[in-house]
A protein has these predicted regions:
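A short, Lys/Arg-rich alpha-helix, primarily the initiator
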Residues: 1-21
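Residues in the recognition helix of alpha-helical DNA-binding motifs
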Residues: 14, 28, 39, 69
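The alpha-helix within a helix-turn-helix
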Residues: 15, 26, 56
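Short alpha-helical DNA-recognition segment
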Residues: 19-38
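The DNA-recognition helices of helix-turn-helix-type DNA-binding domains
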Residues: 32, 43, 70-74
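Short, charged recognition helix plus adjacent turn
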Residues: 38, 67-80
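Short, basic-rich loop-to-helix N-cap that marks the start of a DNA-contacting helix
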Residues: 43-54
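Intrinsically disordered, low-complexity basic tails/linkers immediately adjacent to helix-turn-helix/homeobox/MYB/SANT
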Residues: 57-66
């Protein structure tokens, strides 16, 4: 799993836990829905830390809480 895939999965997981849709998350986070949906698109590779921070603010969690899960602990090495 790539970092981008892990971020997407974590966003979906957090939305499910809080019973909110991606569109709602975008609105409460102050980002456009298209930004959130593009982060979910498997074809897109880049993820902005600033956008992740805004989404965390909308979810009322810290970046540490967001990244503190098994998804990120088991990522493969990015440098080949």
């Amino acid at each position: 799993m790539s970092v981008k895939d892990a971020v997407s999965a974590r966003i979906r997981e957090m939305c499910a836990e809080k019973s909110i849709k991606l569109n709602e998350l975008a609105n409460i986070s102050g980002v456009t829905p298209s930004t959130v949906y593009s982060m979910m698109d498997a074809r897109r590779r880049d993820v902005s830390v600033i956008t992740v921070k805004k989404l965390c603010d909308g979810l009322q969690i810290s970046l540490g809480e967001f990244f503190s899960c098994d998804l990120f602990d088991s990522l493969e090495q990015e440098i080949e």
